[in-house]
Amino acid sequence: LGDVYKRQVGGRVGSDGIHGATFSSLELTEESPSSAVQIGDPITQKKMLDMILEARDEGLIQVITDNGAGGLSSSVGEMAELTGGAKLDLGQVPLKQAGLSSWEILVSESQERMTVGVRPDDCEKFEALASLHEVEATAVGEFTDSGAFVVHHGQTPVAHLPIHFLFDGCPQLNLDSEWSPPTHLPVETPELDEEGMGKLLARLLARPNVASKEWWVRSYDHEVIAQSVIKPFCGTNHDAPGDAAVIAPIQGGTQGLVISNGIAPRYSDIDSYAMAAASVDEALRNAVCVGVDLDLIAGLDNFCWPDPIESSKTPDGRYKLAQLVRANRALDDVCRAYRLPCISGKDSMKNDAMMGGEKISVPPTLLFSLLGNHKDVRKAVSSDFKKPGDAIFIVGETHQELGASELAFMLRDEGSGGIGGDVPDIEPERNMKVYRALASSMKNGLVSSAHDCSDGGLAVALAECCFGADSGASIDISPLQSDCSGLDDWGALFGESLGRILVSVRPSEKEAFEKSMEGVCCHYLGLVSEGDAISISRDGEKVLLGSMSEMRDSWKNTLHGGGL
């Protein structure tokens, strides 16, 4: 890097975010400090990002990293490995408040800050660009080849650490993992007539994992600068759930960006491999629903895990570590099969707390986020049914997979049976063929709506699509028996098999759509209907009948912000 000066760019350092990295690696208690949580400033972030991108395009940046875990101590320390040393003067660092001690300035993780390396000849241009964007860019030190990371606060020495110690001084842990598949009581399903099944679906729609998140989402503005094409909610009343966001960042342009997520922590109770695989597939499936370009996608893996290190407080550490190993194997297997590179991610490995003398741990969880290109946002597809008379299809195979499903947990919570053992299996090659065929149909304008089947299975997905159109639906699930000879009504309606998307098509496009989906699993189920009823049959007999208005009330009144 030669003679390169360090610049802190963006927000100021404050007392927020101090020991944030430590906080995320320790057991939570009532004494855990709130100051470890960073305070966001999206306006400063936006100004800084615009300035950084312009500086990049002008060739003014030699090296850059964000001030995440450990703040300046990590960002400067990490980049110092490139040159073999660095000098840092904490007295030059802009502060939110006076009185911070040297160590607090060094480790604070206050948000919206980048550490940037700039050549001396480019410093004037860099600072002028920062001024233009109203962004602070302060010289805080320089890179050296001294072999040490040297920190001062003005004239006062703070730290002098050999570079080799920073990167090689801590030996890597050698840990043992031990996987033993857990056993659970089987799912026990009740005997219900069609109206009883309708009421059960209404209860399922009220479950927190399924219920409308509208009150939460609308607490924050998702319409800033009017770039959103597919929004969090869609349909006649703008309250039906969308699968993914589509934005058009270039005004007047037709190219867009798709952002989606997948998360399935329930499956970890049976197998964390299935959990991670389902999370990746859900994120991709959600993106497919809006018309993503499957050849331009990338992922971010965010792990949220209970303590996986065996100790007196965590006697099952070997098992939790084995869960982590299995989740990473799934991430590797599925992302390679989908040709889906992971470009970033995060982990938090100590999500445990003592409450009332009892240890509470989060379920092993992978939140998988996906970014993708949309070639033409004018052809983006939303999840809501459009018109009565439209044909309803399901693409992808349905199997008898109720293990750890939302239905299984609801029935268990109501006092009936366990969560079973048959978690959804994944066939990424088969799924990708379905996704590509559907993407081609969307490109040709054959698809009116698309919504993924995930929490609650086909029945929940069907109800959510009806919410968007203020409509009903009448379908026959008999064709699904060709996917799985042992498929019963419960598996067909509430199983959460991966790789499935519920689609509606205009009557005039039905034949063309069926032709475009030849060679992959695609079943015609029925029609969008006028009125308030959702009706599901199998082999000529009604298996579920319910009122959409009652289901909407159940769905919207769980997470409603205290009735506001």
Q: Language-model segments: which ranges?
A:
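Short, small-residue-biased leader/transition segments that mark boundaries at the very start
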Residues: L1-Y5
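Glycine/proline-enriched, intrinsically flexible loops and inter-domain linkers
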Residues: K6-L564
